[in-house]
Design a protein with these regions (language model features):
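Solvent-exposed interaction patches of small proteins and small membrane subunits
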Residues: 1-140
Length: 140
């Protein structure tokens, strides 16, 4: 059985991170490139949002006794295989897991323009993940 308190807490954190990113989504590329603190804030907040999704997915996988994921990317594949996530969202979240690995392990090669582009693209996917999990688990 899924530990609903853990999931609710992680969903609340994810909601906060999405709101924080939403507040910055209209920043222009020129401003983004010129403001090192803003870039780092957005990078870190994107990282935390993806970590929240991974935590939520990991708890569901563990609690439901689903197959053991091979890596972070595979965590979302497991949820997709089990019907928790639609196929297109699963693919997008798997890419986010790859992005997370770059932020954590290969941060020296981060491209600021790529980060800016990710900010512009992922908010809807993060929201959809949150709503899908809430609906699937009956959380209002």
């Amino acid at each position: 059985m899924v530990d609903m308190e853990v999931i609710r807490h992680r969903l609340a954190l994810l909601s906060e991170y999405i709101a924080d990113l939403e507040a910055e989504k209209d920043v222009g590329l020129k401003e983004f490139l010129a403001d090192k603190r803003l870039r780092r804030y957005i990078e870190r907040t994107l990282h935390l949002a993806v970590e929240s999704c991974l935590d939520i997915a990991g708890h569901i996988i563990s609690d439901e006794g689903l197959r053991e994921p091979r890596d972070n990317k595979d965590i979302f594949a497991v949820l997709g295989e089990s019907g928790y996530l639609p196929e297109e969202l699963t693919r997008k979240l798997m890419k986010m897991a790859q992005f997370r690995n770059i932020i954590v392990h290969d941060y020296a090669r981060l491209d600021a323009e790529v980060i800016w582009g990710i900010l512009k693209r992922v908010l809807d996917d993060l929201r959809l993940f949150m709503l899908t999990i809430k609906e699937r688990l009956g959380i209002s």
